[in-house]
């Protein structure tokens, strides 16, 4: 996995609180076991007027031409609540989202996002309000997120955020749970070599 250090991208503002994982990726699309192919169904019930996902809903903000290609999602509090399905961050990542900014995230969703190399940034309600105003009134508005300095830059202003040091280390170095384990492959092999054969 490639590490995340800094990203500048177009922002799509999703001005809704308590968006749950069922809305992010509806249950009928969860049959796959690979991480790809979920992006086309992201917010399926909101993005499309038909079950087949062919007729776009012109009133849903992510379908607006000005937000096509967005890689940063701006949302309200408690984003990613509901069931613990990891398919939700898979769908966001497959769609092209690299950063999510909100006042708060559901705990399991927050951890799953980091495990999938997406950066969930928590800012205050007031700071998020300022970003919504900036993005909605400036077509093509971009935001820069710097994980090394833990700062968000937008419209000439800088906002600080926090991510605990261990998770920040994983994001910066592109490490998921498997990657972390493989860092200790030599020690694991050494330990396994000492295990009596009858225990293997």
Curated annotation (Swiss-Prot):
Record EC number: 4.2.1.33
Record's keyword terms, sorted: Amino-acid biosynthesis, Branched-chain amino acid biosynthesis, Leucine biosynthesis, Lyase
Catalytic activity reported: (2R,3S)-3-isopropylmalate = (2S)-2-isopropylmalate
Record InterPro entries: 3-IsopropMal_deHydase_ssu, Aconitase/3IPM_dehydase_swvl, AconitaseA/IPMdHydase_ssu_swvl, IPMI_Swivel, LeuD
A Pfam family hit: Aconitase_C
GO cellular component: 3-isopropylmalate dehydratase complex
Pathway stated in the Swiss-Prot or TrEMBL entry: Amino-acid biosynthesis; L-leucine biosynthesis; L-leucine from 3-methyl-2-oxobutanoate: step 2/4
Molecular functions (GO terms): 3-isopropylmalate dehydratase activity
Single Gene Ontology BP annotation: L-leucine biosynthetic process
The protein's role, per its UniProt record: Catalyzes the isomerization between 2-isopropylmalate and 3-isopropylmalate, via the formation of 2-isopropylmaleate.
NCBIfam families from the UniProt entry: leuD, PRK01641.1
Family matches, as HAMAP family: LeuD_type1
PANTHER family in the record: 3-ISOPROPYLMALATE DEHYDRATASE SMALL SUBUNIT, 3-ISOPROPYLMALATE DEHYDRATASE SMALL SUBUNIT 2-RELATED-RELATED
Subunit relationships: Heterodimer of LeuC and LeuD.
UniProt record similarity statement: Belongs to the LeuD family. LeuD type 1 subfamily.
Stated name of the protein: 3-isopropylmalate dehydratase small subunit
Taxonomic classification: Bacteria, Pseudomonadati, Pseudomonadota, Gammaproteobacteria, Vibrionales
Gene name in the database record: leuD
């Amino acid at each position: 996995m490639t590490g995340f250090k800094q990203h500048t991208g177009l922002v799509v503002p999703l001005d809704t609180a308590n968006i749950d994982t069922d809305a992010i990726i509806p249950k009928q699309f969860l049959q796959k076991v690979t991480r790809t192919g979920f992006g086309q169904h992201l917010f399926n019930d909101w993005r499309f007027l038909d079950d087949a996902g062919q007729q776009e809903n012109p009133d849903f903000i992510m379908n607006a031409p000005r937000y096509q290609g967005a890689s940063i999602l701006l949302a309200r509090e408690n984003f990613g609540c509901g069931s613990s399905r990891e398919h939700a961050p898979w769908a966001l990542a497959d769609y092209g989202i690299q950063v999510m900014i909100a006042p708060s995230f559901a705990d399991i969703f927050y951890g799953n996002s980091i495990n999938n190399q997406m950066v969930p940034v928590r800012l205050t309600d007031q700071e998020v309000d300022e970003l919504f105003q900036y993005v909605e009134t400036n077509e093509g508005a971009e935001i820069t997120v710097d994980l090394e300095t833990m700062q968000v830059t937008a419209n000439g202003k800088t906002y600080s955020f926090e991510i605990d040091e261990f998770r920040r280390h994983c994001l910066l170095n592109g490490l998921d749970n498997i990657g972390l384990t493989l860092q200790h492959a030599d020690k694991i092999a050494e330990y396994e070599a000492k295990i009596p054969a009858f225990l293997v």
